[in-house]
Amino acid sequence: MQRITIDPITRLEGHGKIEIFLDKEGDVANTYFQVPELRGFEKFAEGRPAEDMPQITSRICGVCPTAHHMAATKALDALYKVDPPPAAKKIRELVYSAF
């Protein structure tokens, strides 16, 4: 099995790497995203209302709070099985494009 390693990865505060394993046909068989630092936010979030997560996760990192906020918001969309209206999708795109 062929392995592709991207180490270090950029646009990440701290350390991290990605390992991609390809099968005999060259298709991705498995992928691992590894970040060795434990931040402990998972424990901090346990027992909290899901609706609080965008505000809590935006404090994970001082470099990219918006990305964490938006990821938590998308997770809420999936949790509640909602599709944001087109205007909201455009606004989210604009926010992502600001960085």
Per-region residue spans from a language model:
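Active-site- and interface-proximal helix/loop "cap" or "latch" segments in soluble metabolic
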Residues: Q2-F99
